[in-house]
Each structure stands twice: as C-alpha cells, then as structure tokens.
C-alpha cells in the first residue's frame, strides 16, 4: 500500500541520523516511501538507511562573527532553501520531519513556507539551535527527553522518546550476564565521531588495575583515526585483548555484549544504552553549547541506570578506582542494567510514526494527545 512520500531531514551525524533511520523503518513498514534530506557527512551511514532516495542539500552553521564567513553561510542556506523547495515541488511529500542539525533548516523552512505538514524531533533534554529556529514554525515537536507540560511550545510537544534502530531492538533481546569473576568486556565509545579523551584516559586507567583484573579484561573501543594506532599499542603493551576502530557498524550488538559501557551522553547513546539495558559510566561532552549531554545523562542517572562523572573530574586514578569497583561488584552492575532497561522506550519509533501520520493527515497535536489518553 503506497501512502505517499515522507521527507526525513537530518544532520549527517549518528546522533541525528540514527533516530531518523529508526523512524524510516517504521514508516516503510506502514506503507510510506521515505526520502532522506541531509548533508555529505551522511554517506558513511547511508548503507543501512532505508530511503528510496537520498538528497544532499547545501547548508551551513550560522555562528561566526566574521562578516565574510557569515555572508557565505547565509548564501549557502539560501541556496539550500531553493534546492529544498525544488525537491518538495517535485516529490510532493505528505510531511517533512526534521531531526536537528543545520542541514534540517532549508527543508523545514521550505516545507513550512509551502504549507507542507511538518514537525521536528528533538533528541536531547535541551533543544538544539537548529530546532529552536524551527520550533515556532512547525505543527508539532516530538521529544526524546523534552517534557510535554512545560516551555513555550508545551501545547504542541509530545514526548515520544528517541527512536532506536532495529539493530538496537534486536540487541535488547540479549539479557545482561553479570560478570561473577569471569571475563569482563568493557565497551568504550564517544558517540558516532569518537572521543579523544577516552583514547588517553581509559588505557591509563587500565594500566593502574592489578594483574588479576587486567587478565579478566577485554576491550572494545572506538577511537578517532588519528588515535587508533596509539590506543592499540597501549593495549598491546598491557596484554589486553582489544578491538579498536574509528567506527563499528554493529555497535548495538557490541553494547549488548558489554559488562560495562563508558561513553559520552548524546541523546541517541543514552537511549540505546537504556533500551539495551547496560550499566554505563557517562562522561558528558564538556564543550556542548547548551550542556545538553549533561542533561541527558542526569535523566538516566536519576533512575539509577548510570553513573555520571564530569570530564574535568575524571583522571586515570579515579577511573581506575571506578573500574576496579565495578569489576568487584557484579550484582550492583546487574541492578544498574535493570534500572537502565526500565527507563528505555523501545516503542518510541512506533509512537513517533503515529504522530507523523497524524500530522500528515491534517490532524493536530491536541487531537493526537486526546486519542492517546
């Protein structure tokens, strides 16, 4: 059954594309054709994204105070807006859904200007800059961590949770096995683009563990390309079996195999760790403009599903102590895993797809909320 085309617009990083991918699978299963509107960075993820077509639209970040760079950004956004208008005129999508990042601005501005039903999904507990620009123009705002009852846009906000990909749903079927004295699998990653801080801190911390604990360890670590060789050499020197790579296509399965996860706290990361149900040490990215990662981490920690430590407070000695305690208290890890799973929203993609269908058919958020209650 062909219900028409839905445009999904997302910035080209995993944090934006992963929830868009999850929604795409749900919409396709419901009979919609999905087109992805994004930037050139999305190429590494395109293989698993179930889009009929992928459209790369020019866009730019507006943040520079340099007048020349500012003019270049404005021109690029204007070029992207014209391109997005042509796409909408050609394909006539039933709705346009934005997932954040500046590449969503041209297609969402085009949609709202041309009368196409539109909504945005905000993954974080704090709304990002691109979504803030669009919030007043769209018909609905779906939130991963945004509360429904507060803020200027409360009337059109629906807390759906963050959609997780089918691979995450599959990984969530694997029960957590508390490591009672046996091998201990540590999984370390920093979001889709890696984290340089972990490349130094984690090997240095493991170096400080006693021999018996190091002999139990197996490490899977995401590292940036420029750090990969150094991280691999550090683990080789310690005799730690380690798999180090800039990108893992099967990250969900690797999280499921972990006894403990150390990671950043982007919205998709927190949502996936929660749905899979694994204990985590969350280290929020300290340079985020809106401190959104700290807010995301706090939401999971409040339920006992993670421990949050600021990067400025985490040195090798402290991390070694945390790892040692974790390896010696498997029952506490199991409880943390159970708490994380309880906070997860495995049906977020289905709920978001229902909201998209409602908006595409001309309904309102008020009617959607009434039907849910």
Swiss-Prot record:
Q: Give me the reactions it catalyses.
A: di-trans,octa-cis-undecaprenyl diphospho-N-acetyl-alpha-D-muramoyl-L-alanyl-D-glutamyl-meso-2,6-diaminopimeloyl-D-alanyl-D-alanine + UDP-N-acetyl-alpha-D-glucosamine = di-trans,octa-cis-undecaprenyl diphospho-[N-acetyl-alpha-D-glucosaminyl-(1->4)]-N-acetyl-alpha-D-muramoyl-L-alanyl-D-glutamyl-meso-2,6-diaminopimeloyl-D-alanyl-D-alanine + UDP + H(+)
**What are the UniProt keywords, alphabetically?**
Cell cycle, Cell division, Cell inner membrane, Cell membrane, Cell shape, Cell wall biogenesis/degradation, Glycosyltransferase, Membrane, Peptidoglycan synthesis, Transferase
Q: Which GO terms describe its cellular component?
A: plasma membrane
Describe which pathway this protein belongs to, using the record's wording.
Cell wall biogenesis; peptidoglycan biosynthesis
Mode of membrane association: Peripheral membrane protein
Give its E.C. classification number.
2.4.1.227
Enumerate the PANTHER family for this protein. GLYCOSYLTRANSFERASE, UDP-N-ACETYLGLUCOSAMINE--N-ACETYLMURAMYL-(PENTAPEPTIDE) PYROPHOSPHORYL-UNDECAPRENOL N-ACETYLGLUCOSAMINE TRANSFERASE 1
Q: What does this protein do?
A: Cell wall formation. Catalyzes the transfer of a GlcNAc subunit on undecaprenyl-pyrophosphoryl-MurNAc-pentapeptide (lipid intermediate I) to form undecaprenyl-pyrophosphoryl-MurNAc-(pentapeptide)GlcNAc (lipid intermediate II).
Family of the protein in this entry:
Belongs to the glycosyltransferase 28 family. MurG subfamily.
* Full protein name: UDP-N-acetylglucosamine--N-acetylmuramyl-(pentapeptide) pyrophosphoryl-undecaprenol N-acetylglucosamine transferase
Organism of this sequence: Sinorhizobium fredii (strain NBRC 101917 / NGR234)
Query: What's the name of its gene?
Result: murG
